[in-house]
Amino acid sequence: MKNLYSLRRFYHVETLFNGSLVVGGRDQESTGFAWWAGNARLINLSGKLLGAHVAHAGLIVFWAGAMNLFEVAHFVPEKPMYEQGLILLPHLATLGYGVGPGGEVIDTYPYFVSGVLHLISSAVLGFGGVYHSLVGPETLEESFPFFGYVWKDKNKMTTILGIHLIVLGFGAWLLVWKAMYFGGIYDTWAPGGGDVRIISNPTVSPGVIFSYILKSPFGGDGWIVSVDNMEDVIGGHIWIGTLCIFGGIWHILTKPWAWARRAFVWSGEAYLSYSLGAIALMGFTACCMSWFNTTAYPSEFYGPTGPEASQSQTFTFLVRDQRLGANVASAQGPTGLGKYLMRSPTGEIIFGGETMRFWDFRGPWLEPLRGPNGLDLNKLKNDIQPWQERRAAEYMTHAPLGSLNSVGGVATEINAVNYVSPRSWLATSHFCLGFFFFVGHLWHAGRARAAAAGFEKGIDRDNEPVLSMRPLD
């Protein structure tokens, strides 16, 4: 049996109260792991590990399908998605399914189809998972050498990496094809308040696309989270999809160079740690993207961002009081600064009051009212459209606030008018998941490095000096 860990130093960290328990024919003595260590018992059983992974994929897809249908069953077309606690239908709507101008849902049938397709797929994956876990060969190397592997086989590992990259690249291109050729995608920046449109001219300039990568993640720079138009989103997927596919082909056709062979730890647990680190980065990125970005996460479906809700409140009262005769350009607030409008330190006309901190907010309902130097006073007096007023009034009362006990909204409001924004759910969950995946990355990286050095199982407790010392009492 090919052992990943040295049997010479086989001192178990896990101290079981019942070390003789045998589950599935694999006990702690034969595998080096207790029953509750799960897939670690299958490190050298490629067939069984395949079953575990396929079954896991089945569970993921089953949740997607079941939750999709649950949201469809509870969906009320007259209410915004973000008022209904939905997190899957907004993603489908963002892809352009079932929605029309302004993000209005005109057909829920595509959502039903999506749920059913995921459920059917989960059944196939579930069957495959059970088959490979219970019936299929324990190891694939003998029967299916193409699918077999040894963790230390550097060439095989990079070939598997290449296959994964090609699949990921194909996934990125699926979004490109959907946006360019198969019905288009929802664009919150479309004139008149958002609409589904074909992205016929995606950004392919490397200078534009890679400038996002080189931006600072701090302050107003925002790294890739600052993307603010669909052309750049789809162009970015063209680049990442193409790079993944060519990178995958490269890794399939080549062997690791000497520096890579020396730099990396080549073991199953090391690959797990690399994966967890990558997923942690994705989790933190998704957290920021879902919280701040209104292009990839349109406010029509996910609710307004914090700055957006704040700006929309001042805009709403500006509209109201202007109708009542207020001179919004010169009215002073309680601090002596402009009540409705003021100048930023660099001279732009911005909303006054507490929302001045969000002066750099950009949103499709507000941008038409800007001029060359911030907000345009003439447009604010003469060009505000009814849809902009309605949108701002709706966003004003749906700030992405929330708390651990799921009572959302402002603390001074009764629960009946409160809600928890999908942005709150998505940002919080992805931050927490990203954090725990990062901890897992550190944990498994440490174990993998220790295993490579030959002391992964700790010291021999039988020889500890403390065992020969007298009791404290």
Curated annotation (Swiss-Prot):
Belongs to the PsbB/PsbC family. PsbC subfamily. PSII is composed of 1 copy each of membrane proteins PsbA, PsbB, PsbC, PsbD, PsbE, PsbF, PsbH, PsbI, PsbJ, PsbK, PsbL, PsbM, PsbT, PsbX, PsbY, PsbZ, Psb30/Ycf12, at least 3 peripheral proteins of the oxygen-evolving complex and a large number of cofactors. It forms dimeric complexes. It is found in: Plastid, Chloroplast thylakoid membrane. This is Photosystem II CP43 reaction center protein. GO terms for biological process: photosynthetic electron transport in photosystem II. [CaMn4O5] cluster binds at E367. It is a multi-pass membrane protein. The modification Phosphothreonine is found at T15. One of its GO terms (cellular component) is chloroplast thylakoid membrane. Binds multiple chlorophylls and provides some of the ligands for the Ca-4Mn-5O cluster of the oxygen-evolving complex. It may also provide a ligand for a Cl- that is required for oxygen evolution. PSII binds additional chlorophylls, carotenoids and specific lipids. The gene is psbC. One of the components of the core complex of photosystem II (PSII). It binds chlorophyll and helps catalyze the primary light-induced photochemical processes of PSII. PSII is a light-driven water:plastoquinone oxidoreductase, using light energy to abstract electrons from H(2)O, generating O(2) and a proton gradient subsequently used for ATP formation. The modification N-acetylthreonine is found at T15. Keywords: Acetylation, Chlorophyll, Chloroplast, Chromophore, Manganese, Membrane, Metal-binding, Phosphoprotein, Photosynthesis, Photosystem II, Plastid, Thylakoid, Transmembrane, Transmembrane helix. InterPro entries: PS_antenna-like, PS_II_antenna-like_sf, PSII_PsbC, PSII_PsbC_sf. The chain crosses the membrane at residues 69-93, 134-155, 178-200, 255-275, 291-312, 447-471. GO terms for molecular function: chlorophyll binding; electron transporter, transferring electrons within the cyclic electron transport pathway of photosynthesis activity; metal ion binding. Signal peptide: none annotated. Residues 1-14 form a propeptide. Its main location: plastid.
